[in-house]
UniProtKB/Swiss-Prot annotation:
It holds the Pfam family Zip. One of its GO terms (biological process) is regulation of vascular endothelial cell proliferation. It comes from Gallus gallus. It is found in: Golgi apparatus, trans-Golgi network membrane; Cell membrane; Cytoplasm, Perinuclear region; Mitochondrion. Keywords: Cell membrane, Cytoplasm, Glycoprotein, Golgi apparatus, Ion transport, Membrane, Mitochondrion, Nucleus, Transmembrane, Transmembrane helix, Transport, Zinc, Zinc transport. Transports zinc ions across cell and organelle membranes into the cytoplasm and regulates intracellular zinc homeostasis. Participates in the zinc ions efflux out of the secretory compartments. Regulates intracellular zinc level, resulting in the enhancement of AKT1 and MAPK3/MAPK1 (Erk1/2) phosphorylation in response to the BCR activation. Also functions as a membrane androgen receptor that mediates, through a G protein, the non-classical androgen signaling pathway, characterized by the activation of MAPK3/MAPK1 (Erk1/2) and transcription factors CREB1 or ATF1. It is a multi-pass membrane protein. This is Zinc transporter ZIP9. PANTHER family: SOLUTE CARRIER FAMILY 39 ZINC TRANSPORTER , MEMBER 9-RELATED, ZINC TRANSPORTER ZIP9. InterPro entries: ZIP, ZIP9. It catalyses: Zn(2+)(in) = Zn(2+)(out). GO terms for molecular function: androgen binding; G protein-coupled receptor activity; zinc efflux transmembrane transporter activity; zinc ion transmembrane transporter activity. The keyword Nucleotide-binding does not apply. The gene is SLC39A9. GO terms for cellular component: mitochondrial membrane; mitochondrion; nucleus; perinuclear region of cytoplasm; plasma membrane; trans-Golgi network.
């Protein structure tokens, strides 16, 4: 019951914090220039979050058991007698086997997340291409895919938190929760600023934000309640928390690189005055993009395990 109470509190905190972070761009009235800067900053936050927070957290979650197992025997190695060294070698060999298996998990999870979003994007765009205005169709599809990608990513986060809660280890739950919050708040901010620039009405943006904010808490509750005892044991065997986070990192990378960054490049090309040759971002926008990439990195460095 304690686990259930903690997952409820964590889910509620996640929902509120995510929604509040996303409302900030809506609450402040930006001029067109400021809105462009905020959009570029949001794009940087999405990219920096994917690379500096989600991928390392997923890898850490995968390797956690092995790392913990290795630290304990390491100090005792000096005191181990000759007869016991054979057993140690066998254990080290086993770790090597586990490492190669986990390497495969990392690549497969990331690629599957990326390919999943690619397929969702293609299926979505095939329905929209029949309209008369292909530019408007592509723009509308981009908004939907960006939101859908982040919702899928948030749902995978929820599965990771639900799987972590089912381990009954408070430290694991808190680590996963902090990791999720470190990127959900910037992602919510980035999503809303992107949708604002894309010209969506404010009410619809709020709906998109609410769906995004709800995805992780709902999935964490469903995962926690839906797992039987045997399922929990099976999930801990295959490190479901790490796999889910890496899958979500793949979806996040797709959204950040394929949709948001090119859109930001498009902003620059369409609004740049003739004197600059119509190429690239302004220095201030480049600075905002770099700052956005660095903020999650600084936050993740401050977040020690």
């Amino acid at each position: 019951m304690d686990d259930f109470r903690s997952i409820c509190l964590l889910s509620l905190a996640m929902l509120v914090a995510c929604y509040v972070a996303g409302i900030i761009p809506l609450a402040v009235n930006f001029s067109e220039e400021r809105l462009k800067l905020v959009t570029v900053l949001g794009a940087g936050l999405l990219c920096g979050t994917a690379l500096a927070v989600i991928v390392p957290e997923g890898v850490h979650a995968l390797y956690e058991d092995i790392l913990e197992g290795k630290h304990h025997p390491a100090n005792e190695m000096q005191h181990v007698m000759e007869s016991e060294k054979v057993a140690e070698i066998a254990v080290v060999h086993e770790y090597g086997h586990d490492h190669s298996r986990l390497h495969a998990y990392i690549g497969v999870s990331l690629v599957l997340g990326f390919v999943f979003m690619l397929l969702v994007d293609q299926i979505g765009s095939s329905h929209v291409h029949s309209t008369d205005d292909p530019e408007a169709a592509r723009s509308g599809n981009s908004k939907i895919t960006t939101t859908l990608g982040l919702v899928v990513h948030a749902a995978a986060d929820g599965v990771a938190l639900g799987a972590a809660a089912s381990t009954s280890q408070t430290s694991v739950q808190l680590i996963v929760f902090v990791a999720i919050m470190l990127h959900k708040a910037p992602a919510a901010f980035g999503l809303v600023s992107f949708l604002m620039h894309a010209g969506l009405e404010r009410n619809r943006i709020r709906k998109h934000l609410l769906v995004f904010a709800l995805a992780a808490p709902v999935m964490s509750m469903v995962t926690y309640l839906g797992l039987s005892k045997s399922s929990k044991e099976a999930l801990s065997e295959v490190n479901a928390t790490g796999v889910a986070m890496l899958f979500s990192a793949g979806t996040f990378l797709y959204v950040a690189t394929v949709h948001v960054l090119p859109e930001v490049g498009g902003i620059a090309h369409s609004h740049r005055p003739e004197s600059t040759g119509g190429k690239g971002l302004s220095r201030l926008e480049v600075a905002a993009l770099v700052l956005g990439c660095l903020i999650p990195l600084v936050l993740s460095i401050g977040h020690h395990h």
